[in-house]
Curated annotation (Swiss-Prot):
The active site is at 27, 45. PROSITE patterns: ACYLPHOSPHATASE_1, ACYLPHOSPHATASE_2, ACYLPHOSPHATASE_3. NCBIfam families: PRK14441.1, PRK14444.1. Keywords: Hydrolase. It comes from Nostoc sp. (strain PCC 7120 / SAG 25.82 / UTEX 2576). Residues 12-98 form the Acylphosphatase-like domain. This is Acylphosphatase. It catalyses: an acyl phosphate + H2O = a carboxylate + phosphate + H(+).
Amino acid sequence: MPNSTPQSQLIRAHVFVTGRVQGVGFRYSTVDTASQLGLTGWVRNLPDGRVEAVFEGVRDIVEDMVRWCHAGPPAAVVQDVAVEYEEPEGLRGFEVKRLVK
């Protein structure tokens, strides 16, 4: 479980997904998949049509989630996934955040 893993072994991926990724269940599929993998973080729609997400957890599992983002749920058409790696913040749970205005 990520909560029992030393902080030094955790990573944080900040992801921006471009394509037909809004209105296709991308956020809720992200929550389901990330939660099943035991990751923490959040996901939200952006006004420019992209989806933004943050995943924190053990490196291999975070990388699995980033790979999942390249396909997303069945109705999504992903064109690009940009990933920035940052210092983990020790997030708890996984949630959908409100749209950024």
